[in-house]
């Protein structure tokens, strides 16, 4: 496509979309749309869905939800958008309940392309995928908390007739602060699901080992709902995390330092670590549990696990992206994924 033709097409598309964007509809007034949905609606209102390029853009958006690349987190990719064709990319990744997913996209300096980011939850029993979060070039970064162990999908799509290089990053982070002062997930010595009492019950939490008297701290802002002593948990504290709709359980404390009805902030000391209750024969530790409304106990580890380290940058020179290159070796391996350990095609 020549530069003059491309410039003319862009001007036509821009004028049509701008004019259409000024017309408020009942749907636009009363229904909140994602940036991608709003752009697609303006395409249709302008009649551009009846043009080849408009149809290709809408088809690419749907295709990215069905045909996507399976990636392992943390993930980073540098890519190139070509102006002469409509495109969209889909990335599938596995997440655990309680993990925060952080997504960001950066464009090369000088690029004015508008790019749409949309995250979805995939459920084999649900069609279409459930939208989770979205963004465009006004804020090319967002995060959300996973509500279940599930596969998610990120769609990345630029607007029509724009080109540019981009770098995409998808990383995981905890949704809660760590509940023991000065420690992290390395201090977890017993995990969810381990047999207890000769297999009569399962461990419904994680055990975080620390010296006696180490502060057990609020992992979220909330309200203290119960301060008690029980045969199994010993000295316990319950914290209602209203932001996430869950209760946090602190057990085997040596001392309780809060009262029912007390409001606490992240990092406030709730008690001191000990080995009360049925932990009398074990070293001092905090039993930390999470109970979600309508779900009961869930695995706390993904909620407090350390954030992913920054993913490795691609080894390909970014200036080569979008260009044709010739392979010098007589034989070149085409692999199923972007790492050496993937099988050859």
Indicate residue ranges for each PLM-predicted region.
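Surface-exposed, glycine-biased beta-strand/turn segments
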Residues: 147-235, 266, 275, 298-342
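Active-site loop architecture of trypsin-fold serine endopeptidases
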Residues: 231-236, 273-287, 291-293
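C-terminal motif of bacterial Sec signal peptides marking the signal peptidase cleavage site
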Residues: 17-19
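Zn2+-dependent peptidoglycan hydrolase active-site motif and core
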Residues: 219-257
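Acidic, Ser/Thr/Pro-rich low-complexity intrinsically disordered segments
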Residues: 21-25, 33, 37-38, 81-138, ...
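Short, acidic/hydrophobic/Gly-rich beta-strand patch recurrent on exposed beta strands
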Residues: 206-208, 236-242, 289-290
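SH3-family beta-barrel domains
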Residues: 32-58, 62-71, 178, 182, ...
């Amino acid at each position: 496509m020549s530069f003059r033709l491309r410039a003319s097409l862009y001007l036509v598309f821009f004028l049509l979309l701008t004019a259409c964007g000024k017309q408020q509809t009942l749907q636009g007034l009363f229904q909140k749309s994602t940036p991608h949905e709003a752009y697609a609606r303006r395409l249709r209102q302008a009649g551009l869905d009846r043009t080849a390029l408009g149809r290709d853009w809408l088809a690419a958006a749907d295709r990215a939800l069905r045909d996507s690349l399976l990636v392992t987190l943390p993930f980073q990719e540098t890519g190139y958008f070509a102006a002469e064709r409509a495109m969209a990319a889909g990335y599938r990744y596995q997440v655990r309940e309680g993990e925060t997913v952080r997504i960001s996209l950066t464009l090369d300096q000088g690029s004015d392309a508008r790019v749409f980011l949309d995250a979805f939850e995939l459920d084999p029993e649900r069609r279409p995928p459930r939208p989770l979060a979205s963004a465009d070039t006004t804020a090319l970064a967002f995060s959300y908390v996973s509500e279940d162990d599930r596969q998610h999908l990120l769609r990345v799509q630029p607007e029509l007739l724009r080109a540019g290089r981009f770098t995409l990053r998808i990383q995981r982070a905890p949704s809660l602060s760590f509940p023991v002062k000065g420690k992290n997930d390395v201090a977890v010595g017993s995990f969810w699901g381990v047999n207890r009492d000769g297999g009569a019950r399962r461990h419904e939490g994680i055990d975080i080992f620390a010296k006696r008297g180490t502060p057990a701290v609020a992992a979220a802002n909330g309200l203290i709902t119960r301060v008690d002593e029980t045969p199994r948990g010993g000295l316990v504290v319950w914290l209602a995390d209203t932001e996430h709709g869950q209760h946090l359980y602190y057990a085997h404390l040596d001392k309780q330092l809060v009262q029912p009805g007390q409001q606490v902030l992240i990092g406030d000391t709730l008690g001191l670590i000990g080995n009360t209750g049925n932990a009398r024969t074990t070293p001092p530790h905090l039993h930390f549990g999470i109970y979600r409304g309508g779900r009961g106990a869930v695995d706390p580890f993904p909620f407090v696990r350390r954030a992913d380290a920054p993913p490795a940058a691609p080894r390909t020179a970014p200036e080569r992206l979008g260009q044709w290159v010739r392979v010098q070796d007589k034989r070149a391996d085409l692999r199923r994924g972007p790492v050496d350990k993937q099988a050859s095609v």
